[in-house]
């Protein structure tokens, strides 16, 4: 039996990178997936690939910093596929990369909203739907930046990603006894457009004990673990998938 047979999942930031790899893997493992990104055309490309592979998918384009987008995602899960069991809140943005004192209030607000407020807006909509099914799994894509390591010029991003652990702990305290598990996945460098050019990827690889960055599919496998029955007693936790960065920093 497939790990996510008869499950329904929402995945944000699904048009590229970790989100796209996660959407395709979850569909392969039997889940019906509601996928989201801002760009409708790129999102439809992912949906088409999933359909061609025999998967069930429904794309919903929209900005995750807007509450109405999350309402549409959850409504689609309920009306198209009958409920919601899993949410992978992956969408985010690095934003301005400069020393902290040089960051404008507007730049700060953008990064916090894109990475933290968007996640709050997501779970505020997702959790009530999960409770109707007796529980579910929420996964936040955080980062090793701000949690195990500070990176020059990335104070805003690191702060936002570290704060996701506060959401994880709060959801666990409020809802774990009702069957909703929340966990964070903390990647190191990953070969995605967000990782930058070849020189930046080489620099990131040097931060990790494994001396390479991850493929998006490797992070999708970790997200699958946190979303599946394999992690049924894992709640309120941070799973580092950082190539050993936390061990050698």
Residue ranges and their predicted role:
Residues 208-219, 230:
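A conserved structural motif in NAD(P)-dependent oxidoreductases
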Residues 98-100, 107-112, 204:
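Substrate-binding pocket helix/loop in short-chain dehydrogenase/reductase
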Residues 8, 15-16:
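Conserved glycine-rich cofactor-binding loop
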Residues 143:
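Residue(s) in the substrate-gating loop at a strand-loop-helix junction
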Residues 128, 147, 169, 173-177, ...:
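Alpha-helical segment proximal to the catalytic Tyr-Lys
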Residues 123, 160, 168:
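Active-site helix of classical SDR
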Residues 94-97, 224, 235-249:
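Short C-terminal tail/terminal secondary-structure segment
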């Amino acid at each position: 039996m497939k790990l996510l047979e008869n499950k329904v999942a929402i995945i944000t930031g699904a048009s590229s990178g970790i989100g796209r790899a996660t959407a395709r893997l979850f569909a392969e493992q039997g889940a019906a997936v509601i996928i989201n990104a801002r760009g409708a055309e790129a999102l439809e490309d992912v949906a088409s690939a999933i359909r061609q592979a025999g998967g069930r998918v429904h794309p919903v384009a929209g900005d995750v910093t807007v509450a109405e987008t999350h309402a549409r995602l959850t409504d689609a899960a309920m009306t198209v596929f009958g409920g919601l069991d899993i949410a992978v809140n992956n969408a985010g943005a690095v934003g301005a990369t400069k020393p902290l004192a040089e960051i404008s209030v507007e730049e700060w607000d953008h990064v916090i909203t894109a990475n933290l407020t968007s996640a709050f807006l997501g779970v505020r909509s997702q959790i009530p739907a999960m409770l109707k099914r007796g529980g579910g799994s929420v996964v936040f894509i955080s980062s090793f930046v701000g949690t195990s390591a500070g990176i020059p010029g990335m104070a805003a991003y690191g702060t936002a990603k570290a704060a996701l652990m506060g959401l994880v702990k709060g959801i666990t305290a409020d809802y774990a006894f009702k069957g909703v598990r929340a966990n964070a996945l903390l990647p190191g460098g990953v070969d995605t457009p967000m990782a930058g050019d070849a020189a930046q990827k080489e620099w990131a690889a040097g931060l990790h004990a494994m001396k390479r960055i991850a493929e998006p599919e490797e992070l999708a496998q970790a997200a699958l673990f946190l979303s599946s029955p394999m992690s049924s007693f894992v709640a309120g936790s941070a799973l580092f998938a950082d190539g050993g960065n936390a061990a050698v920093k």
